[in-house]
């Protein structure tokens, strides 16, 4: 699957170092918004696609509209084009995509249908009627790391990671930095599965981590398998994409949760009002402006620690930078100077780790 493989390179470089001073003219659709969503996977996958599905429902409820949906549309032009064009032929004029691999096809379709608005989650292409959007996931993983550090008895955390890309590495580092806010001696051992969605590999990685004496497992993969393994082993876990406590109620202490509706609702309103100005560099969303948030904290997290997580979340909303300096990597090299903040360009290409992180393949 290529859904997010190159997002770290393409969207990051599109955003990097460019002040968003140039904006397109407001987009004006023909008629009122009629919205459709194209899901990469099944709407009940327990992770990425289900998070979009739940956001779709919340958006419907908030706006009092119906949003049509088609699921299981893979990342090939031969699959994307007919699905989108069928919606357009039926009068839909706002199309929401959910995959990096839709990027090129969405760009072509946006140019072909200039009176249709296109939005694409984790996409990389933008235009006068097209905006890609993603989130600063490291903020939520920093907070989940704090919860993990609070429940760990040994200070040994694990992390089931998909691929060694910046978009994953920044979550691992943030997780460890958050944990050390609670336990300065905490460590995080990460195992890469090489896949975004492979329950077999995720189980193997989670079991390997548990076998090393790790007592909290985090994740940046799609399925809830690491949560399930954690509960089987009698240890704790933190989730990704959705609140995963439904799969492991005894293990789960925190999850990154996508609330795409916080972006979709105001954007669709602007489209309907004729005031939407899609960013030429895409939308890179923080907690404060509709990016991923958290479901926290589980009952096993001490109240004092839960209060600290809540306070840190508010601090991030108020402007605290997770990757603010001074910050050095695990080899002692300065990565962010005192008073500085890591640039978006450096975030997306992150290939280094903070002290306390151990990586395995």
Region annotations inferred by a language model:
Residues 2-3, 17, 260:
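Residue-level micro-sites within transmembrane alpha helices that shape
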Residues 8-18:
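Bacterial N-terminal signal peptides
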Residues 19-24:
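Boundary at the C-terminal end of the N-terminal hydrophobic targeting segment
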Residues 25-361:
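A residue-level marker of the well-folded mature domains of exported/periplasmic proteins
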Residues 1-9:
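Bacterial N-terminal signal peptides that target proteins for export
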